[in-house]
């Protein structure tokens, strides 16, 4: 590519994608100060100067029922993006996450000779692995946060670049517990356990009871311990409080409006659902127990669809069972409390194990701390410069 002012199209479908898009635009401006950015943008991308075809929130739908209800509108929006891009002929199109929306766009554009990148690999390595063929036909390059994702694509000869994880860039290698205590207005001499019941309504429904009963068992064993419960919004707080009133009305907990990251930095141990929270706990160097429950039919299907040995990102990254994963029937208060109590124990052998675990967390953090924004921008430059 000879132009120093490329037209770069970027589509983000939700808040997390908007954050990634803004970081990418900022890093791309170092290479191309006169580039023009257009696509579907949220607040942060708009601040970086990206033009948007429509409000990003028009793409942000959660859950199958909501997707089905909004399908005609989503298809109309996708056609609008495709038609606009074919008319504008950008030098490159970057779809950030939202694979159900973006891969269809990328496939159409690539067929017309427009270079395409998909930023954030779908969990194709874990389930519905046949999607890799669609990804191959839709993209010139996949940008992956995690090294095992690249290893998966390599098996299928799909171009993929491991860029590190933006969260690993955002969290310091040595978490500042003192600062986190100040932020949350907590006594730094106190012992805390963080309890994360999930961000989805279904997770709060399934996990609040076993997690609260676990807290009761720990309190009986360690009377000085206090429990921090960060909740993503007011709706989830009300949902959690209603379950707590039924299950453990006497148990004292400190509920927090968000601030999960600070809570995990403060805590001696964290009890959480699987997902990105487990990676965040690892980066905060918080020893954790992963517990998960779901509807029996969902679990039956998941058992047959999921192709990985582990469900939590720390274990997947390490390719070994670093942290306990207690799923479905195993996710009992007794089991959860037994594993968590080892992190609270002051017995020399337990303290040594806990310190060794934190050291592994540190090594994994360093492994995926690569300045992902800059790496992603360089990948875009490399694809643009390809003939």
Swiss-Prot record:
What InterPro entries does UniProt report for this protein, alphabetically?
Glyco_trans_19
Transmembrane residue ranges:
none
Q: List the disulfide bonds.
A: none
Record EC number: 2.4.1.182
Q: Which UniProt keywords apply?
A: Glycosyltransferase, Lipid A biosynthesis, Lipid biosynthesis, Lipid metabolism, Transferase
Q: Does the keyword Protease apply?
A: no
Q: Which residues form a coiled coil?
A: none
Q: Could you name the domain of life of the organism this protein comes from?
A: Bacteria
The record's annotation in CDD domains points to: Glycosyltransferase_GTB-type
Give the molecular function GO annotations. Answer: lipid-A-disaccharide synthase activity; phospholipid binding
- What reactions does this protein catalyze? a lipid X + a UDP-2-N,3-O-bis[(3R)-3-hydroxyacyl]-alpha-D-glucosamine = a lipid A disaccharide + UDP + H(+)
* PANTHER family, alphabetized: LIPID-A-DISACCHARIDE SYNTHASE (PTHR30372), LIPID-A-DISACCHARIDE SYNTHASE, MITOCHONDRIAL-RELATED (PTHR30372:SF4)
User: What is the purpose of this protein?
Assistant: Condensation of UDP-2,3-diacylglucosamine and 2,3-diacylglucosamine-1-phosphate to form lipid A disaccharide, a precursor of lipid A, a phosphorylated glycolipid that anchors the lipopolysaccharide to the outer membrane of the cell.
The record ties this protein, via NCBIfam families, to:
lpxB
The family this protein is said to belong to:
Belongs to the LpxB family.
UniProt-recorded name of the protein: Lipid-A-disaccharide synthase
């Amino acid at each position: 590519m000879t132009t120093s002012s490329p037209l770069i199209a970027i589509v983000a479908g939700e808040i997390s994608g908007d954050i990634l898009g803004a970081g990418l635009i900022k890093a791309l401006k170092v290479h191309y100060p006169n580039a023009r950015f257009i696509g579907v943008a949220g607040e942060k991308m708009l601040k970086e100067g990206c033009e948007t075809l429509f409000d990003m929130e028009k793409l942000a739908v959660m859950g199958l029922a909501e997707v089905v209800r909004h399908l005609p509108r989503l298809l109309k929006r996708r056609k609008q993006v495709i038609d606009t891009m074919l008319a504008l002929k950008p030098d490159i199109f970057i779809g950030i996450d939202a694979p159900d929306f973006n891969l269809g766009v990328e496939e159409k554009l690539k067929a017309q000779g427009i270079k395409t990148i998909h930023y954030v690999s779908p969990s194709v390595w874990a389930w519905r692995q046949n999607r890799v063929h669609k990804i191959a036909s839709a993209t010139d390059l996949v940008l992956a946060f995690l090294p095992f994702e690249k290893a998966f694509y390599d098996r299928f000869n799909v171009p993929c670049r491991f860029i590190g994880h933006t969260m690993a860039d955002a969290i310091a290698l040595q978490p500042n517990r003192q600062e986190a205590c100040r932020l949350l207005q907590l006594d730094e001499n106190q012992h805390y356990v963080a309890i994360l019941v999930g961000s989805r309504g279904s997770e709060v429904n399934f996990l609040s009871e076993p997690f609260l009963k676990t807290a009761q068992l720990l309190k009986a064993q360690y009377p000085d311990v206090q429990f921090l419960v960060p909740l993503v919004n007011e709706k989830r707080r009300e949902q959690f409080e209603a379950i707590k009133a039924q299950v453990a009305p006497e148990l004292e907990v400190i509920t927090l409006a968000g601030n999960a990251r600070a809570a995990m930095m403060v805590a001696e141990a964290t009890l959480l659902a699987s997902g990105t929270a487990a990676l965040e706990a690892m980066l905060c160097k918080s020893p954790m127990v992963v517990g998960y429950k779901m509807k029996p039919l969902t679990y039956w299907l998941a058992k047959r669809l999921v192709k990985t040995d582990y469900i939590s990102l720390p274990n997947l990254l390490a390719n070994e069972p670093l942290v306990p994963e207690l799923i479905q029937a195993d996710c009992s208060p007794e089991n959860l409390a037994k594993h968590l109590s080892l992190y609270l124990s002051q017995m020399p052998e337990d303290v040594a194990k806990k310190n060794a675990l934190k050291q592994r967390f540190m090594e994994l953090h360093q492994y995926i701390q690569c300045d992902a924004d800059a790496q992603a921008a360089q990948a875009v430059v490399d694809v643009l410069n390809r003939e």
